[in-house]
Amino acid sequence: MAKDQKKQPRPKAETPKGFRDYFGADVTERKQMLDRIAQIYHRHGFEPLETSAVETVEALGKFLPDVDRPNAGVFAWQEAEVPGGGAGDWLALRYDLTAPLARVAAQFRGDLPSPYRRYAMGPVWRNEKPGPGRFRQFYQCDADTVGSASVAADAEICAMLAAALEHAGIRRGDYLIRINNRKVLNGILESMGVAEGKPADDVLRTIDKFDKVGEQGVRQLLTTGRKDESGAFIEGVGLSPEQAEPVLAFLTSKGADNAGTLANLRAAVGASATGAEGVEELAQIARMLAAMGVGEERAIVDPSIVRGLGYYTGPVFEAELTFEILDDKGRKRQFGSVAGGGRYDGLVERFTGQKVPATGVSIGVDRLLAALRAKGLMGGTEQGPVVVTVMDRERMADYQAMAAELRAAGIRAEVYLGNPKNFGNQLKYADKRNAPVAIIQGGDEAARGVVQVKDLVLGAKIAAEASHEEWKAQPAQTEVARADLVAEVRRILG
């Protein structure tokens, strides 16, 4: 090596900012949860769909500005120039599972059944500033019906969501699906004379803060404005008090039951045909949910659900977990939302020029998994494999035969493949793997046709709880005939 040639520094072994690694239980518990949800989706006639992690920026719905890269929010790059000249395509990692569905529905519209019912689960990527609990890669779990304008599709999605939450482990009474309709608000804005476009968008952005600032805060923001907690003044939308009242009546029209809420909404929309249509759709959804056995203790009409109203075109729904947990400061708080969805028409319109109605739901995978752990339904230490220790290198085939017999019996097992010189290190390895049992057979045991079966769980419990006399009287290691190895391990594992 030349003296003036600098030695390359070693790369840092670190996870990129905003990303994380998943180990053991994180992976298996997420898979178990998603498998349970998939069973419900499949039972409802939905088909799985896997799409590429990479889409063209054009298909994702991002538009190239007058700069060298697409809009912020996606991880995007431009391919090399195509042969013969010309710029290469802009590609990006998918930022959700809905945009790829739109592309698939347009690309294969001649082959897919209509309506097309699909579910999809997988990672998505956002090129956003990371923060506590906010990552650039995360999992989504979606189910959508494309091609049906019937509110029966919306009702079915809500019923399926309830079944999926329960099958995943959330008990009935610990969740509530709340349903609203964008058309009802459209009717109210129409009757107020609020034009579509920016005025209506300003109202939508304002009522989105209802759960944070309450009725009085929204009233101020719809009219003249208000000071926030920091003392800064936030400009209001500029509606008159008379114009603001119908919006507030809409937000606060929840009654004692669905019948009461629907009656209040009918009064709130007045003579608006659009609003009346929205109320009737909610009434139909409530009737169909009741027919499917989903009562008001599981799903209700609730006009205070406003998140997403700016995106959806019809019914909107949100699943909220109602049990309490302790926050980082030890204070009680309700767990909150774990899923949301609604009707969005125009899904395929960008590709075909034709409106295609669709409705769907997205479950927050990490949030639902955190909820199951908070309830003690997941998050326990995952049991590792039975570890077959190695006492004699020359007899490795015998040890592998033991592991193979255990696996054939449906028992997770492995042979220790590290340096077998120190037996204590083998037991430390088994402990680190959270192994329930260790198998030991030296030359003496092999000659006698026996094995030692060490119950590591019982051994740890005895060591922690028993007196020395009790410990001697309850050995956690037993000797059995080699032919009885599988039966003894089964007995210990229960």
From Swiss-Prot:
Keywords: Aminoacyl-tRNA synthetase, ATP-binding, Cytoplasm, Ligase, Nucleotide-binding, Protein biosynthesis
Organism field: Paracoccus denitrificans (strain Pd 1222)
Subunit-level organization: Homodimer.
E.C. number(s) listed in UniProt: 6.1.1.21
Catalytic class of the enzyme: ligase
Catalytic activity: tRNA(His) + L-histidine + ATP = L-histidyl-tRNA(His) + AMP + diphosphate + H(+)
Membership in a protein family: Belongs to the class-II aminoacyl-tRNA synthetase family.
Protein name (Swiss-Prot/TrEMBL): Histidine--tRNA ligase
InterPro entries: aa-tRNA-synth_II, aa-tRNA-synth_II/BPL/LPL, Anticodon-bd, Anticodon-bd_dom_sf, His-tRNA-ligase, HisRS-like_core, HisRS/HisZ, HisRS_anticodon
UniProt entry tagged with the keyword Lipid metabolism: no
Locations listed in the record: Cytoplasm
PROSITE patterns in alphabetical order: AA_TRNA_LIGASE_II
Record region (Disordered): 1-20
One annotated Gene Ontology cellular component of this protein: cytoplasm
